[in-house]
Regions:
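Structural beta-alpha unit
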Residues: 13, 79-113, 150-151
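Glycine-rich, Arg-bearing micro-motifs that act as flexible, cationic patches
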Residues: 112-138, 148-151
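Small/aliphatic-rich secondary-structure junction motif
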Residues: 2-57, 86
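A short acidic, glycine-rich active-site loop
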Residues: 54-72
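General small-molecule cofactor/ligand-binding pocket signal
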Residues: 32-34, 89-93, 144
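Conserved acidic residues
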Residues: 2, 111, 140
Length: 151
């Protein structure tokens, strides 16, 4: 039985990526569903290309919000996987999604990483890249990209 890491980032595309992975791979695998929530304040790029200042938010507020985000992400994933008969582990972590996904793939010795992919636009790809690009280039094993389809 192979070990498959299905990586999600707490977006609305998660259920679709998980569904597609299960359709393609079937139930004869051990699944690790990893959701990585980016636990930092994103910078805002203004119209002129400058970075807008981000207002200060107390750490306690961020910590509480992050806890709530973890609970909601796990609840959504459990709902999506309720009919699956395979061995499933769910983990929710914080940090840089690309880095954490690749690190967990190494730690767990997975055979395949499945990650959703959608068009983030050329500017964003140049400035910050995308999670799927990062994982595709740095994962220690094969990567299956599930392209987001418009619904």
């Amino acid at each position: 039985m192979s070990k498959v890491l299905v990586a999600t980032t707490g977006t609305e595309f998660d259920a679709q990526a998980i569904d597609e992975a299960l359709k393609l791979l079937g139930s004869g695998h051990e699944y690790l569903i990893l959701t990585v929530l980016q636990g930092e304040v994103p910078a805002i790029v203004g119209d002129g290309g400058g970075i807008a200042p981000v207002m200060h938010i107390p750490p306690e507020t961020w910590i509480e919000q992050e806890k709530q985000d973890h609970v909601l992400a796990e609840r959504r994933i459990r709902k999506t996987l309720s009919e699956l008969g395979s061995d499933v582990e769910i983990r929710v972590e914080s940090g840089d999604p690309g880095e954490r996904i690749c690190a967990v793939a190494v730690e767990e010795g997975v055979d395949l990483v499945v990650v959703g992919s959608h068009d983030v636009g050329t500017l964003r790809r140049v400035l910050g890249g995308s999670v799927s690009d990062d994982v595709a280039h740095h994962a220690p094993c094969p990567v299956l990209l599930i392209r987001h389809r418009d619904v």
